[in-house]
Amino acid sequence: TRRDFLRKGAFAGLGMLTMSELAKAVVSKQNGNVSPKIKLEKDSVILFQGDSITDMFRKYDCNQCNTPEQMGMGYALFAASTLLSDYPDKQLKIYNRGVGGNKVYQLRDRWELDTLAIQPDVLSILIGVNDFWHILMGNYKGSLGIYERDLQDLLHYTKEKLPNVQ
């Protein structure tokens, strides 16, 4: 429908804006090399994790890396396409495990299977829209403090389990 088209177009536009900032922060080129902030080795595993902005209509039943179906239609797809095109010799393995509607505690609930089991070398997390939005809608009793605490706890837990993750 027209409404679906407009909704998807708005999300894709937001994803493209987000991707450009993510690309600047995560992967930048300096004389043809990857920025020292993120080191991509041969066979590096990259994981995009988060809520609907990451999800962007990905197919949940597709678990293969580097496929458009599991990348969705947002910034994860654009970033993966760029990385795979720019660094074909690195044979990167890129996954998207974003789930629409998720808040930080829901991300934590699926962390073992959807993050730690993948063993990413590089992890990108984009989460927080629903933590705020659902408070405004009266569907969630969270707060900024809960969001910050839950996210910090998740990051610390991840570094304990995957000490070399970037």
What spans do the regions from the language model cover?
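Flexible, glycine- and charge-enriched loops at secondary-structure boundaries
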Residues: C65-M73, G101, M137-G145
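Solvent-exposed loop/turn segments at secondary-structure junctions
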Residues: S52-D55, V99-V104, V129-H134
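Alpha-helical cap/lid subdomain in secreted, periplasmic
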Residues: F78-K93, Q106-Q166
